[in-house]
Every structure is written in structure tokens, then in C-alpha cells.
């Protein structure tokens, strides 16, 4: 049985991926700093997890490991008074450090990148050869890590970067700051859908289980050509305008109203729905993505989920968990607000290291 180390194993994706891999005959070891370990929506998998900062991974942690799936990182921005360099530079440094250790030990390395590196895509579909135009420190960080991996690649080390589309779907540690999840949760609990933008920006979307499927394919794929393999993960059918996602949600939650935050800022008094990257109702991030390469590269790969099916599944999950507006608005399910809460209450340093021992953390 192949042993796989998953960094960021207690996050939104990691909490699904670890169980998925274990159900597909892999032995999983989790490695997570624990920022979101208490952000529980449903019962997470009982994966063996080491609660440590990814900056502290050493060669001993990689003993007996076949592949590292590197999910760990900071998943939202901007961070109020926190300096972007202090937040994101360490994630680039430790991604490169872990990759270097994998190279030395002959371990496969799979990096969780993002389609957000494309930023502004123009009228056509962007693919892996299209110029990257990252619009945020988060997406720039993803691109920089890819560049570092490309520089490390040689005949002894052939890493893989999976550029995930915007994720959606249920997770034991669900995020409600992802567009489809947010709109579905909002409609279910409040009877309203509030859009940050005018709804016209395009977004590629991918279900969390299809992300897991792509990771499994990457682990099994025989890639030894001495280069970084970059693959977009998703399906063209899930390239949707935000307004179309809202309509898919309305179809599953009949009677919910559609409103626009730019027309009435009072709609989001808690500041949870507001996307700080959207200014005056205008979101410059808009792109549609081609996923032809992953289908060509991984034999038999295709996405099983579309957005309407994912919304239907989420609504069923919300009913099963008795999701309320109070739970939906809890900061635990919004990465930016959760991190800022930990920082402002002196649990974290400016470079996002724990300041308190394990027994005093949330």
C-alpha cells in the first residue's frame, strides 16, 4: 500500500482528500498546522495527523512516503493589516523546501495550484500555455511556487502542479467563502442570494471529489520526463458566470431572492459575504479555462460533477446537518475571518506561526 503525505490535511480539501485516498487503497498521513481543526461541519476522517507547521517538515517526516500532496498554504487574501509578503513568502519557501527534500529522497511531489493564476482571460479559453496574469498575492504565490518547481525539475525529479478551478461541494470542514458554497448556504439559510459583483465575471468550477480524483490520477501517473507537468483541473461545462451559479442555486432553493451588494452594502453587516477583491461591484478576475490537457494526459479522467448536481447535493447535506443562518455565518467557515480572528486575539504571529502551546489553542 502506497503511503501518501498530505499537507493541509485538516482544511477544506484535505478533509475530503484524505478519506478519499484511504478509500482508494492508499495509506494517508496528514500534516497540518491546525488553524481550522475546530471548524467542523460534519465528522472528518480519522486520518493520522501531525499537528505542525509545514515550515517544520524534515526528512524524517518523509520516511517511507511514496508521494507528497502539498495542499498547505494560505487560501484567501487580502489580510487587513497583515503584510502580504509576511503571509505568502513563507508558503513559497516551505513549498520549495519540501519539494527539495522530495527530490533528494526520490518522492513524487504534487502541488495544489490554482486556475486563478490566469486572472484576466479575455474572450477565449485559456490553457496551460496561456500567459498568467495573477491579480492577487494568493494567485501570484501559486505561480511563483510553480516557477520554483520548474527550476527544480530534472531527470531525477518530475513534479506535477494541478491548477484547480474554484472548488465547490460538501466537506467535513466546509468553506462558505467559495462562490458556489456561499450562494447555496446563503439561499438555504436566509432565503436570499447576495452577489458581490454584477454577476458577469466568468469562473471555472470543480467539485471537491473531482479534485480528489485528479490527485489520485497524479499519484498513479508515470511522469518522469524531467519537467514540471502543469494541468488545469475541471471541465469546460463548469465554466460559468457568477449569475448562472446563482440561478442554479435558485433552482434548488425556490423562492430565494437575488440581490446585489453594490446596491445595498447593509445586506452584509457581518462582512462575511463581502469579497475585498471586488471594488464597487466590479470584479476584474474573469476567465474561462480549457481542461483538454488533463483528459489527454490522464487516461479516462473526466469530471463527474457539474454545478447544479453539486448544489443539489449540498442542499441535501445542509438539511441533514440542520444548517442554520447562525452556523452559516460562523467565522469558522470563512478562512480570512478565521485567520484574522486568531491573529487579532494573539494566537498567531504576523508571519502566522502559533504563539500559544497546543493546549491553549482553539
Regions from the PLM with identified roles:
Residues 82, 86-97, 132, 136, ...:
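Glycine-rich NAD(P)-binding loop of the Rossmann-fold in SDR/ketoreductase-type enzymes
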Residues 7, 31, 68-71, 109-115, ...:
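SDR active-site strand-loop-helix element
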Residues 114, 146-171, 181:
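Conserved beta-loop-beta element that borders a ligand/cofactor-binding pocket
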Residues 96-137:
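Conserved Rossmann-fold NAD(P)-dependent oxidoreductase catalytic core, especially the SDR/UDP-sugar
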Residues 4-23:
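N-terminal Rossmann NAD(P)H-binding glycine-rich loop of SDR-like oxidoreductase domains
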Residues 54-90, 101-103:
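NAD(P)H-binding glycine-rich loop region in Rossmannoid oxidoreductase-like domains
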Residues 191, 196-362:
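C-terminal substrate-binding subdomain of Rossmann-fold SDR/epimerase-dehydratase oxidoreductases
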Residues 120, 133-160, 188-189:
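Active-site Tyr-X1-5-Lys
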